[in-house]
Structure formats: structure tokens, C-alpha cells
């Protein structure tokens, strides 16, 4: 069946949605937008097994501003994915609080609104794709919500264009590359018009080209659409492009700051069993070799510029 058949089905608009979908307009200036907090964790504690003494999250307190791009780093088992799942109430705190736009995730009456506000994209796109045609998959959740057919058509088309998959709209997802599939999953979430997008290792299974395509899409959504992004990742080059970086270890946030503030502490980052961006590593090696290099280099452009100036 085609998407046209989906749109012809009668659906009732769910008045609880309480928004006019896709009428977002131009995003506010980032400085103004990022004054407002959208996600808050207060002394958050969580265990997967209440009979065990080890906490996956042990007193985590942090917040994310509206419009911000936050990267969360940490070794395997540090709690970063567990934290992500608390931000849209997939998991609930054992103690402490998590708020999404002021809504308590422990409030059953707010779960619907919280999951409208915060969308998630997971590591394996095949686990989120449910339809046999790309545009049908992007429309799937909207159909379930009873979004009017004309609005559904507009939102599906706009989301596919933003994710760079409009040309694949009539293709079968299983014939797409990993990066293209992940962008289908992103389009499906974006069509719901979330204010915040959580990426849980969303590029981990992709090749370098696929990672680049997905991250270009994510940065477009953040910069041009004003969507808040929290990216759980182990790719340092991705984290270096964020507004802010959180580093977790054993259920705690142990480092926090801008990418320059965090990655300039190369020895501390390595002590947490993490890599640093290649440019930062090269800068350290050049300094060890007696070549003066400025502090805070975290990308190849900065490194190349510093070397160019030294050679003048």
C-alpha cells in the first residue's frame, strides 16, 4: 500500500497534543534560546537490580538548556545511556528527580507530553524502522496519533527533506545504507515535532561516511530548527562539535564544560579510558617535541592554522 492510502484513512485528531504541528517558524537567537532549561536531573539515582549495591546512576545532577547541543561521553557501563533513557521516561529514578520542561517524569499524567517533547534515536536503526516504504515509516507515529491527512503529508515531506532522504521516499528501507536508514529513523522522530532529540549512540554502527551524513543532519536540526540535542557518543570528533560536553564515570558526572575546556585536560580524559580528538593528541605530541602550540586545540582546522602561523 502507498502512503496515499494512509492519508485517506479516517483519523481523529488527539486534542491532548495541544500544538499546531510544524508551525515552528524561525528559531530564536541561540543566546536567548539557551537561557531556558529544558532537561533537569536532580540527585538522580538508579539501579537496574535493587538487590545489588551498585548504582548505574549515583547522584547525577545536571541540566540542559533549550537549543543546546550536549555530548555525553564515558567508558562502557558509565551510565550515559541510562541517563539518556531517563530524559524521556523510558526509565524512572529510584530516587531524585528528572524534569522535562518542568514536568516530573514520575508523573504518569505527564508521560504522553514528555514523550512528545523528547524524541529518541537509538544505535540500531533497524530497531526503529517498522514499515516497508520510507515515507510510510516516517508517517507511522503520526498516523497512530490521528494527525489530519493534509498535516501528515506536509510534516512527512518536510521531515524527509530536512533529513536528506526525500529522494528515497518510495524505496524500501532495507535497501538503504546504514547512514540512510538512521536518517529515516531521525525523520520519523522529527516528524513528531519534538523540542529535544536524544541520540543514544546513533552513529555507533555506521561507517565514516554514514556518520558524517547523520551528524550533518543533526547539526542542521539543532542550528536551523532550534531542536535541543543530547548525543551519547564515543566519537571524540563528534563531541568536539558540541556546545558542551559531559563526561561520566561509574554513575557520576566527573567532567563538564565546553569541548575546549574538557579536551584541553588530555591526561584526565585519558585517565577515564577515553580518547581525545586527534587534533588535541597531535598538539600534545608537537609540544612534547618542543614545538610551541597554543592551548585548547581540538579540531584539525585550528591545528593547521597554528602550524601555518608558526611557519610564517
Where are these regions (language model features)?
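Conserved ABC ATPase signature
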Residues: 172-176, 180
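Conserved ABC transporter NBD signature motif
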Residues: 96-106, 114
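Helix-to-loop junction immediately C-terminal to a conserved catalytic motif
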Residues: 88
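Short, small-residue-biased leader/transition segments that mark boundaries at the very start
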Residues: 1-7
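The feature captures the beta-strand-to-loop junction immediately N-terminal to the Walker
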Residues: 73-75
